[in-house]
């Protein structure tokens, strides 16, 4: 039995149960944007749609070889199957929109915009002055970010805002998948969703990725992007979501915009301006302040 699923020895806790859920979240936060920063570097060799395809399909292959997740899909009840199908569709479209956005905008800017949706969703589900203030702060931060760069790449912001909407669906569906069926592992359900995403994105991305399949360097880089972007962070997300209350998880999510900025500076040399830094800070405060519905 895998240490992700069961006991590691007689009477002992599974290995993952001995790791604090906060540690999984920190690992997820780092890899969530480290992988895309590598993808930006890969854009010089492979078109955006091709990189998105490489990311998702390589992750799907890892899950297929590691977990054989179709068994969890076939064993699940019909509502859980629909949830996995929906999450797979969101994975495919969200990653494509995200890559189209970061191809032209700084990673930190796209990451900050990403959180407008979850904060708005929190206000819709739990109307309070706290959530209203959180939304106003987030909107103010996003406004500053778009004001700085909108004139240079207006269409890129359309992709960024589409990604924000899809990221909201990801949070809702990923929480549902993590708790969908106690008889199967959440990692297996995640893997099934990733395979579905690979099928969904193939009509759009395969032809763009085809040249990379004959280029060992580009292909290897694509696999690294897939593992660091769609295997490690999503697995860590599932392990954190399963043990953290939604309110606590939402608070930790406030760290992600700052994480994206730091990785953008280190890996991509994307140093934000003073106004952009204020925008990211406002978004982070807004995300930390908001409280999702119970």
How would you describe each model-predicted region?
Residues 1-50, 89, 93-97, 136-143, ...:
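Glycine-/small-residue-enriched transmembrane alpha-helix faces in small-molecule transporters
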Residues 1-30, 59-86, 127-133, 150-152, ...:
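Membrane-interface interhelical linkers
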Residues 2-8, 56, 254-294:
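C-terminal-most transmembrane helix of multi-pass membrane proteins
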Residues 17-21, 45-53, 76-81, 142, ...:
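Juxtamembrane helix-entry segments on the extracytoplasmic side of multipass membrane proteins
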Residues 26-34, 38, 66, 85-100, ...:
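Hydrophobic alpha-helical transmembrane segments of multi-pass membrane transport proteins
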Residues 33, 57-61, 119, 139, ...:
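Small-residue-rich packing faces within the transmembrane alpha-helices of Major Facilitator Superfamily
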Residues 50-60, 91, 98-126, 163, ...:
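Specific alpha-helical transmembrane segments that line the substrate/conduction pathway
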Residues 63, 116, 129-149, 163, ...:
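Hydrophobic transmembrane alpha-helices of multi-pass small-molecule transport proteins
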């Amino acid at each position: 039995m895998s240490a992700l699923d069961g006991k590691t020895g007689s009477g002992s806790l599974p290995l993952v149960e001995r790791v604090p859920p906060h540690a999984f979240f920190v690992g997820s936060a780092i890899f969530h944007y480290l992988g895309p920063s590598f993808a930006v570097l890969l854009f010089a060799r492979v078109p955006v749609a091709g990189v998105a395809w490489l990311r998702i399909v390589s992750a799907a292959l890892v899950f297929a070889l590691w977990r054989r997740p179709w068994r969890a899909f076939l064993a699940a009840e019909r509502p859980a199957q629909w949830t996995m199908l929906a999450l797979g569709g969101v994975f495919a479209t969200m990653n494509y929109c995200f890559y189209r956005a970061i191809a032209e905008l700084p990673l930190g800017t796209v990451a900050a915009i990403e959180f407008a949706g979850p904060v708005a969703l929190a206000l819709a589900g739990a109307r309070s002055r706290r959530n209203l203030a959180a939304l106003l702060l987030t909107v103010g931060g996003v406004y500053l970010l778009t004001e700085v760069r909108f004139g240079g790449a207006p269409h890129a912001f359309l992709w960024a805002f589409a990604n924000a909407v899809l990221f909201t669906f990801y949070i809702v569906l990923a929480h549902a998948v993590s708790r969908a069926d106690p008889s199967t592992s959440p990692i297996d359900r995640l893997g099934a969703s990733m395979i579905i995403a690979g099928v969904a994105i193939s009509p759009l991305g395969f032809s763009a990725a085809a040249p990379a399949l004959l280029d060992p360097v580009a292909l290897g880089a694509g696999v690294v992007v897939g593992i660091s972007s769609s295997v490690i962070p999503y697995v860590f997300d599932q392990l954190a979501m399963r043990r953290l209350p939604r309110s606590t998880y939402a608070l930790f999510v406030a760290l992600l915009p700052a994480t994206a900025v730091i990785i953008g500076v280190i890996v991509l040399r994307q140093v934000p301006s003073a106004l952009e830094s204020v925008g990211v800070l406002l978004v982070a405060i807004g995300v930390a302040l908001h409280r999702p519905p119970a």
